[in-house]
Curated annotation (Swiss-Prot):
Catalyzes the attachment of serine to tRNA(Ser). Is also able to aminoacylate tRNA(Sec) with serine, to form the misacylated tRNA L-seryl-tRNA(Sec), which will be further converted into selenocysteinyl-tRNA(Sec). GO terms for cellular component: cytoplasm. ATP binds at residues 262-264, 349-352. NCBIfam families: serS. Belongs to the class-II aminoacyl-tRNA synthetase family. Type-1 seryl-tRNA synthetase subfamily. Keywords: Aminoacyl-tRNA synthetase, ATP-binding, Cytoplasm, Ligase, Nucleotide-binding, Protein biosynthesis. Pathway: Aminoacyl-tRNA biosynthesis; selenocysteinyl-tRNA(Sec) biosynthesis; L-seryl-tRNA(Sec) from L-serine and tRNA(Sec): step 1/1. This is Serine--tRNA ligase. It comes from Helicobacter pylori (strain HPAG1). Consists of two distinct domains, a catalytic core and a N-terminal extension that is involved in tRNA binding. Its EC number is 6.1.1.11.
Length: 415
């Protein structure tokens, strides 16, 4: 959540950030401006009534001590108190309206984030490893998976519905091996391995920004205040919800393997075949909580950590700086890692490493204490990596002409 003080003091800065995101709030934004104007006016009036109450109360005390008639002052105090209570209630209601609007306003766009109107304006930063030149037409992963008997898409539909799959046989061993490899690499880079619940309450999803705005994107348990997590970002970040951390304990670096669940609202017709876009998928996540001065360096560290895994698996990939219009709700700056898929003849996202600055920390009340003063921390998150998409990339990049898959040396010891 952005700072309410910033909204009150520099409304135009917030409006400009929304414009950079190509985020249309239109009349809603103007109504918010009107509410803020009304709130400021009432706040000044409230402060005046409070000052008057304090002044008259002092006079009342002096006259009482002097045993002078105070009946007029008493009546004045009582009348003013009624006005004070009514206005205080009105100001409180306006604050609630502002905070409700604040909860659905996305993060401010970072100065480093380039302006853009769509994902077409994202900027390639660098490429790592050169894509292989095939002497045959490479197949897509779902063809290879079915040929090798590794992924059963029909059973996924039978057990649940479309966008679910069953991984079996040697494919399941590769899937498990990838998870272990990812966790080992992340641990080597200083991230603590943590296993968390796959269900969280509403407060946790508010903390990381999924609620209230993206309610349609998550699965809710019927008759329970519980939701299936869309990412371990939710659980890892919220381990420190409403917590004050000693500055000496920063940075906090965590990694977790979890199943993730997403409704994929708005994705009809996209990636309908294969494992690219599933309702349930596994992901190994990185989350960091840092001092406000250290989050930029941490973002670079997290990117390199994820890239290290792809290099070990001999998978060509690139870093892509997202433009302002392609940023996620909570992100101030995001760099994607896209892996090369020869079967599709394109790069596809396999990780997004985002710096949310103090946006999530303000929502979740994650603070650190330095020099006896509490400050908002910065939080970062990123995949390291999406397991299914890594398996997709492994199959497509290391396929042989007969449909068999070469296993990279780094993965051999996990099989």
């Amino acid at each position: 959540m952005i700072d309410r003080k910033l909204l009150l003091q520099d409304f135009d800065k917030v409006a400009l950030s929304l414009k950079k995101r190509n985020h249309a709030m239109g009349d809603e934004l103007e109504r918010l401006r009107e509410v803020i104007t009304h709130y400021k006016k009432q706040l000044i009036e409230l402060e005046g009534l409070q000052a008057f109450q304090n002044k008259v109360s002092k006079e009342f005390g002096i006259k009482m001590a002097q045993k002078v008639d105070t009946s007029d002052l008493k009546k004045e105090l009582e009348n003013n108190k009624i006005k004070l209570n009514e206005l205080s209630k009105s100001v409180g209601e306006l604050e609630q309206q502002i905070d409700l609007k604040l909860s659905i306003i996305p993060n401010l766009v970072d100065e480093k984030t380039p302006l853009g109107a769509s994902e077409e304006d994202n900027i390639e930063i660098k490429k790592i490893l050169t894509p292989r030149v095939f002497t045959f037409k490479p197949k897509e992963h779902f063809e290879l998976a079915q040929q090798n008997g590794w992924i059963d898409f029909e059973s996924g539909v039978k057990l649940a519905k479309s966008r679910f799959s069953v991984i079996r046989g040697f494919g399941a061993k590769i899937y498990r091996a990838l998870i272990h490899l990812m966790l080992d690499f992340n641990e080597k880079n200083g991230f603590e391995i943590i296993y968390t619940p796959a269900l969280v309450n509403e407060k946790m999803l508010f903390g990381t920004g999924q609620l209230p705005k993206f309610k349609e994107d998550v699965f809710k348990i019927e008759n329970e205040n519980l939701y299936l997590i869309p990412t371990a970002e939710v659980t890892l970040t919220n381990l420190y919800n409403d917590t004050i951390i000693g500055v000496e304990n920063l940075p906090i670096k965590m990694t977790a393997h979890t199943p993730c669940f997403r409704s994929e609202a708005g994705s009809a017709g996209k990636d309908t075949r294969g494992m690219i876009r599933q309702h349930q998928f596994d992901k190994v996540e990185l989350v960091a909580i840092t001092h406000s001065k250290e989050s930029d360096a941490m973002q670079e560290h997290m990117l390199e950590s994820a890239s290290e895994i792809l290099k070990a698996l001999e998978l060509p990939h690139r870093f892509v700086q997202l433009c302002s219009a392609d940023l996620g709700f909570s992100a101030s700056n995001t760099i994607d890692i896209e892996v090369w898929l020869p079967g599709q003849n394109c790069y596809r996202e396999i990780s997004s490493v985002s710096n949310t600055r103090d946006f999530q920390a303000r929502r979740a009340k994650i603070r650190f204490k330095e020099n006896q003063k509490n400050q908002l921390a910065h939080t970062l998150n990123g995949s390291s990596l999406a397991v299914g998409r890594t398996m997709v990339a492994l199959m497509e990049n290391h396929q042989q002409e007969d449909g068999s898959i070469h296993i990279p040396k780094a993965l051999e010891k996990y099989l």
